[in-house]
C-alpha cells in the first residue's frame, strides 16, 4: 500500500532535515525568540529565525543561544533585499499626513532608516553556521550558496 502524497512529502522533508516530526517554525522577523526555536527543535521539529531586521552580532547570538539549548535542527532565513527606493518628498509628505490621522506624527527622517547590511548578515550566517539557511523573495547570490555548501550548511529553497 502506498503512502498518501502529503504523508510522503512530510516524510521526505523529515528525512532531508533529520527531523522527528514535520513541524517547521515560521522564520518571521522579530517573532522568533531563541527559546521558542529551542522548544520546537527539542520536540523534533525545525526551529527558525527570521533575520531580516537583525544585525550580524544578533544573528551570532541567536544561533549561539539556540545551540546552547538544543542539538535539534534550526534555520536562519533572510529576505532578499529590495532595490533602493526612488524617494519622492511630496509622496512621503502625503503618506506621513495620512498616517498622522491614525496615530502619532511620523517624523520626516523615518524614511531614512536603512535595513541591516545584507552582505554582513550573510557573512554572519556563514560564520554562525546554522543547520539550514533559507531565503524569501529571491535566491542568494551564487558565491554565497557555494560558500554555504562548502561549510555543510543545508539550503532550504
What is each model feature region?
Residues 2-157:
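Active-site entrance/lid segments in N-terminal catalytic domains of soluble metabolic enzymes
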Amino acid at each position: 500500500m502506498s503512502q498518501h502524497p502529503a504523508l510522503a512529502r512530510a516524510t521526505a522533508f523529515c528525512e532531508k532535515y533529520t527531523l522527528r516530526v514535520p513541524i517547521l517554525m515560521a522564520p518571521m522577523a522579530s517573532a522568533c525568540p531563541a527559546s521558542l526555536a529551542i522548544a520546537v527543535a527539542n520536540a523534533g521539529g525545525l526551529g527558525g529565525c527570521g533575520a531580516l531586521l537583525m544585525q550580524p552580532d544578533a544573528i551570532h547570538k541567536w544561533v549561539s543561544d539556540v545551540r546552547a539549548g538544543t542539538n535539534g535542527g534550526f534555520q536562519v532565513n533572510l529576505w532578499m533585499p529590495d532595490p533602493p527606493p526612488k524617494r519622492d518628498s511630496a509622496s512621503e509628505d502625503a503618506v506621513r499626513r495620512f498616517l498622522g490621522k491614525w496615530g502619532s506624527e511620523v517624523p520626516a527622517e523615518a524614511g531614512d532608516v536603512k535595513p541591516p547590511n545584507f552582505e554582513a548578515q550573510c557573512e554572519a550566517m556563514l560564520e554562525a553556521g546554522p543547520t539550514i539557511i533559507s531565503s524569501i523573495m529571491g535566491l542568494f547570490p551564487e558565491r554565497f550558496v557555494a560558500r554555504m555548501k562548502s561549510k555543510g550548511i543545508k539550503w532550504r529553497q
